[in-house]
Amino acid sequence: MARVTVEDCIEKIPNRFRLVLMAAHRARNISAGSELTIDRDNDKNPVVALREIADETLDMDSLKDSLVNGLQRVLPSEDEEDAAREERGQQMEALPAPPVELDEAEMLKALQNDRDGAPDGRL
């Protein structure tokens, strides 16, 4: 088959940016195992995607919807954020208390016990 040019595809999708997005999305779909609508003819996925667009063998509306769904980000609702905040608060409450400050004499005694191997209930 003759080489596919952007001019062949611009007639089908007039906006070059949208054309690139649609062709790239279709090429990714082909890479993911989507069924081809034309013969591959030993072409790579981007070329096959452009040929499919130029030959109008694709349903452009479903391809556009698939592209939009793939680009959308799902933002958490306020209820989910509140629940996550509450859960983090409960986790913070479950943390052990901060270490107790020791004066110099208690610190010296603890260090000597560690050195001498005196049992203090630790494993």
Swiss-Prot record:
| Keyword terms, alphabetized | DNA-directed RNA polymerase, Nucleotidyltransferase, Transcription, Transferase
**What family is it from?**
Belongs to the RNA polymerase subunit omega family.
Tell me what this protein is called.
Answer: DNA-directed RNA polymerase subunit omega
Q: Give, as one word, the top-level EC class.
A: transferase
Cellular component GO terms, alphabetically? DNA-directed RNA polymerase complex
Biological role: Promotes RNA polymerase assembly. Latches the N- and C-terminal regions of the beta' subunit thereby facilitating its interaction with the beta and alpha subunits.
Give the quaternary structure: The RNAP catalytic core consists of 2 alpha, 1 beta, 1 beta' and 1 omega subunit. When a sigma factor is associated with the core the holoenzyme is formed, which can initiate transcription.
**Which residues constitute the signal peptide according to the record?**
none
Key word Transcription present in the record? yes
Instruction: Kindly state which reaction or reactions the protein catalyses.
Output: RNA(n) + a ribonucleoside 5'-triphosphate = RNA(n+1) + diphosphate
**EC numbers:** 2.7.7.6
Q: Which domain of life is it from?
A: Bacteria
Q: Enumerate the Gene Ontology biological process terms.
A: DNA-templated transcription
Write down the Pfam families for this protein, in alphabetical order: RNA_pol_Rpb6
What InterPro entries is this protein classified in? Answer: DNA-dir_RNA_pol_omega, Pol_omega/Rpo6/RPB6, RPB6/omega-like_sf
Organismal lineage: Bacteria, Pseudomonadati, Pseudomonadota, Alphaproteobacteria, Maricaulales
Q: Where is this region: Disordered?
A: 72-100
Q: Which GO terms describe its molecular function?
A: DNA binding; DNA-directed RNA polymerase activity
> Coding gene?
rpoZ
